[in-house]
Every structure is written in C-alpha cells, then in structure tokens.
Amino acid sequence: MNISQNPSPNFTYFSDENFINPFMDNNDFSNLMFFDIDEGGNNGLIEEEISSPTSIVSSETFTGESGGSGSATTLSKKESTNRGSKESDQTKETGHRVAFRTRSKIDVMDDGFKWRKYGKKSVKNNINKRNYYKCSSEGCSVKKRVERDGDDAAYVITTYEGVHNHESLSNVYYNEMVLSYDHDNWNQHSLLRS
C-alpha cells in the first residue's frame, strides 16, 4: 500500500516487519510497537529511537484461545503433555493482537464496544495493576488488557486479542441514525441537528 494513495490521513499501514512474538513475557512491552494517541487528537507513528519513548503499533496473528482471523503470518505451536502420554499435535485457533499506547488521565477509554472486567493482577516492574476485560457481546471472544505504562504513568497501554464477530455499538447507532434520515425534511430530525 502506498501511503500517498491512502484516503484517510489518520490511518497508518504497517508491514509484516512489525510483528512480535506472542510467546514473549506478558510483562515485556519494550519490544512492542504502539500507536501513540495524544489527548488533543494528534495521532501518529513515532519512530523507535533510544532517545525517544517507544510509541508504535503492532498487529500480529498468534495462536491463542481467542477466535478470529488476521492478515498476518500465522504462528503455530504444538502442545505437549508431560503426563506420560504421546505428544499432542493440536494447533489452537489463530487470533489477532493489537496494542495501543495512549496518553490519557482515565484508564479505560470508550472504544465503541461493551466490556466485562474479569480480572486484575500486579505486574512485575510496574506499580500499577493490569486489568483484564472480555467483550460482553454474546459469542464474541475478544479480550483486552489495560495497564498504565511502567515508565510513564501518563500513558495507558491497551492490548486487544482477537477479532470482534459483531459491529460496535457506535456503528449500530450511526447506521440507525443514517437510516432515519429523510432527504426532504432533514431539519425535522433531532438526531441530525447539531
């Protein structure tokens, strides 16, 4: 994809070179790539340098419990048991993982989906706890982790695992609003007034 042909100036395409190892320690975010979002709405990719903070995005396909698909390279993992039985050659379903690093005063930001908190745990080398969420839509197995950056508490790291099998609530609301639009009497609709 040629960036100059990109119709959306806020979208950034990343190639396969930015994929990360899904089996790395969950506490090691130093190798992740994050998308940096300022409170003022200034979005952008910041090159990874020693003198600047890491603020890059990463998207990958990995083997895991959550369902979904991605357009990235699939990593396979063979499971084995140590109970004296034969090794299992089962390959788990593939999923998709994306991490965002956002400058924010609040921990959990509205991303258009409904989430149910199912856990919280202390993270090594970080005074802030990591929160775990599952998508509350029936049949959707997407999970997200939310935690404050250990180096700079002004940033929140949100990691999504999986792909939603449904539309976000904001898309449903927007589609209903557009469907109720009357081309002849657009001033009469309270949803479309500013």
From Swiss-Prot:
Keyword Repressor: no
SMART domains with a match to the protein in the record: WRKY
Record localization: Nucleus
One BP annotation, GO: defense response to bacterium
GO terms under cellular component: nucleus
Gene3D superfamilies the UniProt entry points to: WRKY domain
Chief location of this protein within or outside the cell: nucleus
Pfam families reported in the protein's UniProt record: WRKY
A single MF term (Gene Ontology): sequence-specific DNA binding
InterPro entries for this protein: WRKY_dom, WRKY_dom_sf, WRKY_plant
Changes seen on gene knockout: No visible phenotype under normal growth conditions.
Keyword DNA-binding: yes
PROSITE patterns: WRKY
Keywords: DNA-binding, Nucleus, Plant defense, Transcription, Transcription regulation
Quaternary structure and partners: Interacts with CAMBP25/VQ15.
Role according to the record: Transcription factor. Interacts specifically with the W box (5'-(T)TGAC[CT]-3'), a frequently occurring elicitor-responsive cis-acting element. Involved in defense responses. May act as positive regulator of salicylic acid (SA)-mediated signaling and negative regulator of jasmonic acid (JA)-mediated signaling.
Recorded family membership: Belongs to the WRKY group II-c family.
Protein name, UniProt field: Probable WRKY transcription factor 51
